Amino acid sequence: MKKLHVFGAGLSALTLAVIATSAYAALKDGTYETTAMGNNGEIVFQTTIKDGRITSVQVVNSSETPLLGQEALSELSQKIVDWQTINLDAVSGASKSSAAILQGVNGALIQAGGSAADLKSIPVFTQLQPGILPDVRTDVVVIGAGGSGMAAAIEAKNRGARVILIEKQPNVGGTTLFSTTSFTAGGSKLQMAADKPFTAEDFHRKLLAEFGEDSANLKQLADRSGPTIDWLIGLGADLTKVINDSQHVSPTGKALGTVVVPVLKKEVDRLGIDTRLQTKAENLVLSPEGKVTGVVVSSPSGRYTIHAASVILATGGFASNPDMVAKYTPQWEGYPSTASRGSTGDGLVMAQKAGAALSHMDVAGPQTVAYDTGHGAVSLTNVRYNGAIIVNRAGRRFVNELGNKNTIGLATKAQPEGVGFLIFDQTCLERGELLKKYKAQGYFVEAPTVDELASKLGIDAAGLKATLKDWAQVYATKTDKAFGRKDSIFSAINKAPFYGQKTSPANQVTFGGVTRDTEARALTAAGKPIEGLYVSGETADQFGHGVSIAITTGRIAGEYAAKHALGK
């Protein structure tokens, strides 16, 4: 593969050349790797050119901010392929990320044989007119290439099945990519080697206490979570630090999604799994007997059917679909989303049409501390897990900051203006890379004293100082009599400088989904399995914690879908 490094301040979107088909028809076929400087460092791109068209733009490596830079890269890569041009406006709030991808593709076109003269600005938008393409056949098709879908595809492939993995967005990762906290589990090798082992049974009890409803699926999640995190670590995921008994985190404080997604993507590539990006599932194919036998998909190249013995729906939840939020979780209507833009409930709709039942659709796990950057909401959950507290305008705590997400979200919603304030100190900040990165991006208000921080945030200084005095006692005794917090008590919050930020809830995780059994089979309202249809991750009805649900249930779905497809 040929490589070109693109440096400098870069061209603006308005001055970048428009590449019409006639202008680059003679470019050499191939995949070209380029780099360009984004907001948080260099970004690596791979641009594929075939038969005079840009057929793919992939982001190979990026440290851009989730929901801003990362989403801008996804959006523009799709537009470049769909419209066959790099004369595009920057995505609002992500100008550096936008400029980087336009530079990167421009560099690839030059490397493929283009010249400055070829890349002249002409207002041509050559939309590809999709046609009907030949059908394809496989054993297992996985719909959705987030954490759950990739885990399912890997498991099915390892069990001998032929697998096709499709994703409607230009990049893999889904909402898993935006997770900033931890992989919760019980019975992992690290946990069992601790002075006080934390077993799968302990984890099951913890989940039951948090969600209040037991099921065979909840027990299975607890039992399988330990082997799943062991598997991820074996693939190279650096989640080798355990905090608060159940949470596996990066020792350096990296965001969970940026650790997990690249590892899964690497394994998908190593196994040679047929991955088709910008490929949207339109509807499931059903036999006269009601079996699911495939899926009709559309891509920039055309529309076709993938026939498969097993279909896995791993399309995520519906946190980014305002209409579904209003219908199923109206308590969070009008709040922004910190989930992937692809979390629009597609799989739930398809499953219902195939006869599947939905359960617990009114239960959501909102992002409890979202910060409005002015360009979108960003999760600051990682701050809670590094020792912060949450207070209201009076400077007083009002909830267990590490409790049930829904409880925290509703408690925050009930405060004046529906907001809370994260409060923490330098000790908390120094615990991980992500908090330092957030500080550099201007996400925190900083002050040398508690009084000045309170003034900047607009909260009562006397109330905040009284709260911090109480918190010092919680830190000293590791006992929170007021709210029962037991986890992440890492700082007395007394080391200057002090930090804070106004936050509010946001839509992120939806727990309701397709009713399923412990073999991941979608069930009808009568409890009958729908042959050939499997569900995982947020698409499934499953209580638990985001990425732990995604990867664990993904592997379960991949296992049983492969067994069904291969007749085992």
Per-segment meaning from a language model:
Residues 299-370:
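Glycine-rich loop(s) and the adjacent beta-strand/alpha-helix scaffold that form part
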Residues 348-350, 356-461:
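An anion/pyrophosphate-binding glycine-rich loop and adjacent beta-alpha core
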Residues 326-349, 539-566:
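A conserved FAD-binding loop/helix module that cradles the flavin
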Residues 26-123:
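Active-site- and interface-proximal helix/loop "cap" or "latch" segments in soluble metabolic
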Residues 147, 223-302, 321-324, 475-495:
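Conserved redox-cofactor binding core of oxidoreductases
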Residues 87, 91, 162, 171-274, ...:
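Conserved N-terminal/central alpha/beta ligand/cofactor-binding core
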Residues 58, 283, 463-543:
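A glycine-rich dinucleotide-binding beta-alpha-beta segment and adjacent secondary-structure elements
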Residues 130-148, 164:
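Beta1/beta-strand and adjacent pyrophosphate-binding region of the FAD-binding site
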